[in-house]
Amino acid sequence: IILLGFIALLAVSCDKDDHLAPDKSKYVYDIPQTDLPVDAIVGAYYTNITSSSSWLKSGKKIYAGTPLLGEYLSTTSGVLQQQLAWADEAALDFLIVTWDAASADNTLITNFKSVRTATNAKVRLVINYNTKHLKVSNDKPLQEEENLNKMINDFTNTLVPLFNDEAYYKMNGRPVILITPSNLSSSALKSIDYSLVIPALKKAVSELGYDLYTIGEFTTGWVAPVNYEEHQIASFDGVTVNDWSTNMYDRYYAFFSFVDLNWANWKTTISKWNTDFVPCIFPSYNDRINSTSSYKYTFGQDGETADYINFCNVAKR
């Protein structure tokens, strides 16, 4: 009877239409030209190049063509001046600099402020605070007093003084700070509880006169927000996802509409926590130049302007 009932249920509940291919137009579609009623706030990641080896992999160049500034180091005279000039030409509001308590990080920040003042550049600075140097683990998580105090001391002793500088970017008076990573590795899921860490950090910084605007950085794209713990998203004022690699053919073939659907899902899902979604875009590139064994699909050797415009339109939606 159970077997017959199961078969009968299948016979009633199934319809041949259920097995037809989905409507392609729902998933693969063109992105329309999109205009914003006001100017967007725009920032860009800055890579601090501290070694000539950064331009090589296994002794071979990891780029094609000729860099306009050559195989530079960020500390090379004239480099930062030109980069800030380009940033102003592009109307960037800020450059994002990673800070992981390394001396090279502090040197770059010092140089940035100095060059900005000397050249009357307009672009400002935002810190991306990397928790790696805190060496937290499931057994010694960041929310434990000792580790949390280390993080707070990083801010009170080094980063908060930057907020006093006109060169640091503030949104409506609130210093913007990225904190990475929001996506914790599967072996370290208990190493950070952001629902405890971020309020404690904000409280400490507010006692020094600043209301932080925190952005959690997810370094892995294509993952739906429901796959993360609530604290990894809801603890922040905003979140950004910065890796949209075309590591599958479908993601390459329908890249812009797939990203559009993904971002719409992010915005809808996290709105219940009053968390902003901050889109992250990038020019197309050929990853096989960086790694001959790369399996990522590429849009073209040199990138196409039309592709970048499409990506910008996705972000503006």
Language-model segments: residues:
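Sec-dependent signal peptide recognition
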Residues: I1-L4
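C-terminal motif of bacterial Sec signal peptides marking the signal peptidase cleavage site
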Residues: L10-S13
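Bacterial signal peptide processing site
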Residues: D15-D18
